[in-house]
Amino acid sequence: MNKLYGVGVGPGDPELMTIKALNDINKSKTICYPGKSDDTSIAFNIVKQVVPEIDEKIKVCIDFPMTKDPFILEEAHSKITNDIKELLKKGDVALLTLGDPGVYATYSYIAQRLKADGIEVITIPGITSFSAAAAELGIPLTLADEELHVIPSSYSFEEAFKLKGTLVFMKSGRSYEKLASYIKKEKFDYDIYMVENCGMTNERLFVGAKNLPETSGYFTIIIVRGLK
């Protein structure tokens, strides 16, 4: 039976892709990736830099809905699952995802549905955006007994500041202005870092709350260290 590979391609730098990710992409008949077109799909273009022969494969662009509406999501996930089932009739399928497939990725919903239907699904982990961001900043995420909390900042984030250790705010772009304003207003005595478009050619790094920019893009990570 043909398999679905959920392939984490890392945060943006193609050199951060794993050998296993490359091998499973190469062995797959069809490559699926998020976006509206080849040109605008970040995941596809990361892979294309190191697997130029990807253009010779069957390519399917998947438009994942950016919404919290459960009805829209249910309909979309059902359609995507059925589409992948059809593609699996032709051979193995690699579904690309930015970062790691297990961290806030639509892939996980699709994988669960396919597994329930008896289809073999293999997940290939990727380097997370926040691990890469910390490396770019030259800082540790945790030391000794410090806790690490990953927060989707597109939801409520205020309560997170009551936690201890390190906070990582993902998907900060949509709520960035609100989050940055909150951090500046509260004048927290913590170490504040921000990375926009980690690993990409337009990457930007910021250190300190006072240096946070007024606006930022969707692929923004904010790291808060030193909560006690």
Task: Show which residues each predicted segment covers.
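Class I S-adenosyl-L-methionine
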Residues: 1-14, 19-22, 26-119, 212, ...
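Structural signal for conserved beta-strand scaffold positions within catalytic alpha/beta enzyme cores
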Residues: 33, 60-63, 123, 143, ...
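Short, surface-exposed amphipathic charged segments that create phosphate/polyanion-binding patches used
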Residues: 72-81, 136-139, 162-166, 205-211
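A contiguous loop/helix-start segment that scaffolds small-molecule binding in enzyme catalytic cores
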Residues: 4-6, 93, 162-228
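Class I SAM-dependent methyltransferase SAM-binding "motif I" and its flanking Rossmann-like core
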Residues: 102-163, 213
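A short, acidic, amphipathic alpha-helical segment used as a generic capping/interface helix at domain edges
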Residues: 83-85, 153-158, 174-183
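A short acidic, often aromatic-flanked loop/helix-cap motif at beta-alpha or helix-coil junctions
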Residues: 64-71, 156-158, 200-202
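Short gly/pro/ser/thr-enriched loop/turn and capping motifs at secondary-structure boundaries
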Residues: 38-40, 67, 128-131, 200-202
